[in-house]
Amino acid sequence: MTYSLAGQTITAPDTGGHGLDMSHGQDWLVEDCLIDLSACPLDQLDEAVGVVWGSSAVFRRCVIRGAGKLVLCGSGDTDKLNVERGKTVIFEDCILEDFGRRGPEAQSGMRIMLRGCLIRNWGAPDRFDVRSFASWAHHGGSIEAVDCVFDQPRAWRGWHIMVRDWLAHLGQAWNDEGLRGLLRPANWLPGVCRGLVATAGGQVRAENCHATRWWIRLEGHRGPHMSRSQAQALMARLENMR
């Protein structure tokens, strides 16, 4: 059975702290929805969207914004690995913006496909908790981005955030891979630079994508990049969805 949601606006979390909680093997189709948790205190939130425990989802023409942790695909629970492995979450013509991290994050063997999406302003100062990144795959998760734009308004977020973020990423690298993780140059990147990255057994792939800043890292990119004019046209088209 597929659960459908269309034309809805979500501005507050459920009792579990999620804007939209997809779990227990549910399949979802979400179209033309706004999930905006920017008015909610971070301590009242978990993810804006969580797709876990054997669920899958397709998002079309949605705007998801304003959470510390935006989109998590895969719970990381070892007892759920068998039901999560191979499940797919697709984002088509979506905007993911103004968040701290997980825009999106894939783990536990889950697969994310980004098609014609805008990922913008991760590590937003008012949504930052412990570290920041946009799209991250690890522990068997994978992310494929095609025709997407990764946009950051600025690199510097203040000493307090930058130092906390950098130390938290090094701590995560140590927790995931030990000394080997600390020896990987990519693990020393500040979060604001992490547009599309994979560590600790994750995989990422990109085609015809564009980073608006030279310092935004897009790993696994194959073939020519989207031009600046094409990126501006895509962003304008997506903005017209609002």
Locate each region found by the language model.
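Extracellular beta-strand/beta-solenoid scaffold signature
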Residues: 13-22, 41-52, 66-83, 98-105, ...
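Solenoidal tandem-repeat scaffolds enriched in leucines and small polar residues
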Residues: 87, 110, 122-123, 141
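Short, low-complexity, Pro/Ser/Thr/Gly-rich segments in the mature regions of secreted, periplasmic
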Residues: 238-240
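A generic "binding-loop/recognition-motif" signal
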Residues: 16, 26, 55, 100, ...
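Feature marks extracellular polysaccharide-active and adherence modules
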Residues: 6, 11-13, 23, 31, ...
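All-beta strand scaffolds that present successive hydrophobic residues in beta-strands
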Residues: 3-7, 28-32, 57-59, 89-92, ...
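Extracellular structured ligand-interaction cores
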Residues: 46, 59, 91, 101, ...
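Short, charged low-complexity linker/loop segments at the C-terminal edge of domains
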Residues: 156, 212-215
